[in-house]
Amino acid sequence: AASDVYKRQSQVIERDGKFYWYVTVEHKDIPGKSIGVAVSDSPLGPFVDARGSALITNDMTVERTKIYWDDIDPTIFIDDDGQAYLYWGNTQCYYAKLKNNMIELDGPIVHVDLPRFTEAPWIHKRGDWYYLSYASEFPEKICYAMSRSITGPWEYKGILNEIAGNSNTNHQAIIEFKGDWYFIYHNGGINPTGGSYRRSVCIDRLYYNEDGTMKRIQMTTEGVQ
């Protein structure tokens, strides 16, 4: 109900046995990019529109910028207390709390001030630290900030991943699996037609320093096994 085309830049998250898919869409009535949400009983789908309307539309963020593509790249994080947060943005980073139903905002949209933020926010937590990673500048590197609270204030920590091969763009995810941490990103390594918008998914190991900061990613051709 919210869109005609441009379904990309998305994330699926599970809550109470339901799978919620947050996705960037092109709104059919309100100019600019929007964020919609669909729901399914399975991560494989089928997904159906959970609201009948967009969750975020471009007219909700005009105070910060007049561009029509700032409302993209949604990511969801459910904190230890059960509160869910939606982060998103291009050139400007935003967050908002979600209600328990996962399809309505529960409070105002908040702007997050990050150095040289371009797009692709991602939240993860390790111990008592929250990490906000994002694509920075163009061509895009992945940078990150840390905080003791998911709502900040955020302390910038620098570059996590340099420009990936043959790609001006990048978009990351950071996950823990069986006690190890992994950095998921893309490059343009597909031969012979790979590039910024024909991308290969890459996975490499992520390591932490004793103070909780993250070590710079060592990109490999082989990935992980």
Show which residues each predicted segment covers.
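Beta-propeller fold detector
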Residues: V48-L55, D106-D113, E155-N161, K215-E222
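Structural motif
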Residues: I30-G36, Q92-K99, E140-A145, P192-I203
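Short loop/turn segments immediately following beta-strands, especially the blade-tip
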Residues: A38-G45, K97-L105, Y144-G152, Y207-M214
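Hydrophobic core segments of beta-strands in well-ordered, beta-rich domains
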Residues: R8-P31, K66, D73-Y94, W122-S136, ...
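Surface loop/turn motifs at the tips and blade-to-blade linkers of beta-strand repeat domains
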Residues: T65-W69, H111-R116, E162-G165
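Asp-box/WD-like beta-propeller blade repeats and closely related beta-sheet repeat scaffolds
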Residues: I30-I78
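Short, small-residue-biased leader/transition segments that mark boundaries at the very start
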Residues: A1-Y6
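Loop/turn-rich, solvent-exposed surfaces of beta-rich toroidal or solenoidal domains
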Residues: R116-W154, G158, S167-N170
